[in-house]
Curated annotation (Swiss-Prot):
Coiled coil: none
Source organism of this protein record: Salmonella typhimurium (strain LT2 / SGSC1412 / ATCC 700720)
Keyword flag Electron transport: no
Name assigned to this protein: Phospho-N-acetylmuramoyl-pentapeptide-transferase
Family to which the UniProt record says this protein belongs: Belongs to the glycosyltransferase 4 family. MraY subfamily.
Required cofactor(s): Mg(2+)
Periplasmic membrane side: 1-25, 93, 153-167, 220-235, 284-287, 359-360
Membrane topology: Multi-pass membrane protein
Topology Cytoplasmic: residue spans: 47-71, 115-131, 189-198, 257-262, 309-337
UniProt cross-references to HAMAP family, sorted A to Z: MraY
Keywords: Cell cycle, Cell division, Cell inner membrane, Cell membrane, Cell shape, Cell wall biogenesis/degradation, Magnesium, Membrane, Metal-binding, Peptidoglycan synthesis, Transferase, Transmembrane, Transmembrane helix
Gene for this chain: mraY
Coarse class of the protein's main subcellular location: membrane
Function of the molecule: Catalyzes the initial step of the lipid cycle reactions in the biosynthesis of the cell wall peptidoglycan: transfers peptidoglycan precursor phospho-MurNAc-pentapeptide from UDP-MurNAc-pentapeptide onto the lipid carrier undecaprenyl phosphate, yielding undecaprenyl-pyrophosphoryl-MurNAc-pentapeptide, known as lipid I.
Amino acid sequence: MLVWLAEHLVKYYSGFNVFSYLTFRAIVSLLTALFISLWMGPRMIARLQKLSFGQVVRNDGPESHFSKRGTPTMGGIMILTSIVISVLLWAYPSNPYVWCVLVVLIGYGIIGFVDDYRKVVRKDTKGLIARWKYFWMSVIALGVAFALYLVGKDTPATQLVVPFFKDVMPQLGLFYILLSYFVIVGTGNAVNLTDGLDGLAIMPTVFVAAGFALVAWATGNMNFANYLHIPYLRHAGELVIVCTAIVGAGLGFLWFNTYPAQVFMGDVGSLALGGALGIIAVLLRQEFLLVIMGGVFVVETLSVILQVGSFKLRGQRIFRMAPIHHHYELKGWPEPRVIVRFWIISLMLVLIGLATLKVR
């Protein structure tokens, strides 16, 4: 919005030309989302407390979590609000990639909101029925994937980028739709599963978004894309603005979500952020990179799959409790230790993921 306005005002004052610089807009996008999130935080927490929108805690969970019962949840609303406002202000409104991310972000946010609302207001511990949750998540993911396939068919936008191999970028054909679906829905659920401790999900999300900001910048720059042997995608540069907005909103939320948390993001935040990371990976053709950089989310999800599978097949559990962060809690690790160690692992994985772009 402001970019469009600046383009019309630059003929009156050349200083408005600064709005055309991607680096400048990335920085102010981050700061805008950060300040909106910090401003909304106390007001959102007070409002959620007044409405008695408190966290529901499992009776079979770690005893240390019982004290969290009643802590305001659905704080993801302020994350999404911060991201959307910042992106609309600083990204080019004509960029289709930006709108793809916003559709998934808002769509998954609505699904998460309904799920949280049923849990918190209607006191339904199961929330939105699983089949309906997956149905609507699938509708959004398949809709976006199909639209992208129709537009980008037989172009670099539908190639598969394979790490470590600079000349291996096969055309996916219709498999592009299926892969995109699994990445978007899978990442949405993976971040949702990770969101079980104070600040555990938001910081890896920030790290991955920051990593993708660098990848988006390189992908949207023909010289760097050729240098790194990744597809050049002319719309990818604007995803830098989206990624930095996620970073800013995430850091602002962490101010209130750090241990001991004053507010939880709820499904409205975790599903939306996960879906956003998934569609960003799809748009940048970096699904494999997401698996590496988002390794914490992958391990959390695998721990649940292995736990359920083992119990159904053998009648035995592999972990004391899944997702795996609860396993370490039940082993006696203090919650802050689990959180910070997962943060460190996440940062390392993002750096390793970025390094794979050059190792080809």
